[in-house]
Design a protein with these regions (language model features):
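Helical "lid/coupling" subdomains associated with nucleotide-phosphate turnover
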Residues: 1-45, 49-56, 62-268
C-alpha cells in the first residue's frame, strides 16, 4: 500500500532511475541490461539538476517530483477515467484525444456540457460502431484531470519550485504510452508550463521490475548487504522526502473545483 509501489521508480542512494519500455525492447535481445540507458537524477552524474516529475496515470494517479536532494510524492484518485472504459471500448488516452477534438469543435462548452444536439445520446465515434462519448464519460474525465492538476500543484509547492522550473515530465503507464500530449495540454490535464518537456514513456512498471531484478541479483552476488539495503530502501535515503495526502490539504476542495472546467479559448 506504499505510494512508491505504484511508481515505476528504483530509488538508490540519492538516485532515481526511470526506464522506458522502448529501452527494454531495444536491450532484451542482448545481454546488455547492466548498461541499459536510464533517465536519472544523481548528484554525481547530473549536470542539470532541475526537478523531474514522474506521473503514472491509472485508477490511482501516482506522482513523484524529485531531484538529487529531495523527493515529494502524492496520489490522486482518478477513478476509471484513465483506465480502459469497458462500456465504450476505448482507452483513457482515446477519451482525452476525443475530448480535445470536441472542445475545438465546440460540441462541449468550457464546463464540459455537451451541446443540446448531443446531450442525450452523446457523440458518435466514427471509427467505433455504435460507440458514443456521453456526458458521463466527460464528467469522469473532468474529475480525474482536476485531481491530477491538484496533485501537480501541491507537489511543486511542497518541493518549493514553480511549475516552469520542473525540467522534465514523464507520463507512464498504458495510458501514458498512447497519450496525445498536445491533447493532454488542450483539456487541462497537464499545465502549459510543461510544454516541450513532457514525454510519454509507456509501461515503465515492467521495465523497472526487470532492472530491479537484475540489480538485486548483482548486489546479492556481491555479498554487500549494505548496498542492498540502500538500493531497496523505498526512497528513505532521500533526506528530504515528503508524502502529500491531497484530501488533508486545507484548500483542496476549492482548488479541485477550479480545475474541473476546460479552457474556453479554442479555435475551430
Amino acid at each position: 500500500g506504499d505510494i512508491f509501489s505504484g511508481i515505476l521508480a528504483i530509488c538508490s542512494t540519492r538516485m532515481m532511475k526511470v526506464v522506458t519500455s522502448d529501452e527494454i525492447l531495444d536491450k532484451t535481445a542482448c545481454d546488455g541490461m547492466a548498461t541499459m540507458p536510464a533517465i536519472s537524477a544523481d548528484d554525481k552524474t547530473t549536470t542539470n539538476n532541475s526537478p523531474t516529475l514522474l506521473i503514472d496515470l491509472g485508477t490511482n494517479a501516482e506522482m513523484v517530483l524529485f531531484d538529487s536532494d529531495q523527493m515529494a510524492a502524492t496520489s490522486a484518485a482518478a477513478g476509471s477515467a484513465f483506465d480502459s472504459i469497458a462500456d465504450v471500448g476505448l482507452f483513457g488516452a482515446d477519451v482525452v484525444a476525443i475530448l480535445y477534438r470536441l472542445l475545438k469543435e465546440h460540441r462541449i462548452d468550457c464546463h464540459g456540457t455537451l451541446q443540446d444536439e448531443w446531450f442525450e445520446q452523446g457523440v458518435a465515434i466514427e471509427y467505433k460502431k455504435q460507440v458514443y462519448i456521453t456526458q458521463d464519460h466527460i464528467r469522469r474525465m473532468q474529475l480525474a484531470k482536476a485531481a491530477v492538476r491538484c496533485g501537480i500543484d501541491y507537489l511543486s509547492e511542497a518541493f518549493g519550485c514553480a511549475l516552469q522550473d520542473i525540467g522534465q515530465v514523464y507520463v507512464a503507464g498504458g495510458f501514458g504510452y498512447y497519450l496525445d500530449v498536445e491533447a493532454a495540454f488542450g483539456v487541462g490535464l497537464l499545465p502549459d508550463a510543461f510544454r516541450g518537456k513532457t514525454f510519454a514513456c509507456g509501461n515503465t512498471a515492467l521495465s523497472g521490475a526487470r532492472v530491479y531484478g537484475y540489480d538485486k541479483l548483482v548486489i546479492k552476488a556481491s555479498g554487500n548487504g549494505e548496498i542492498h539495503d540502500k538500493l531497496f530502501s523505498n526512497g528513505s535515503d532521500f533526506p528530504k522526502k515528503k508524502i502529500i495526502n491531497l484530501a488533508m490539504e486545507p484548500d483542496f476542495n476549492e482548488r479541485y473545483i477550479s480545475y474541473l472546467d476546460f479552457s474556453s479559448d479554442y479555435e475551430i
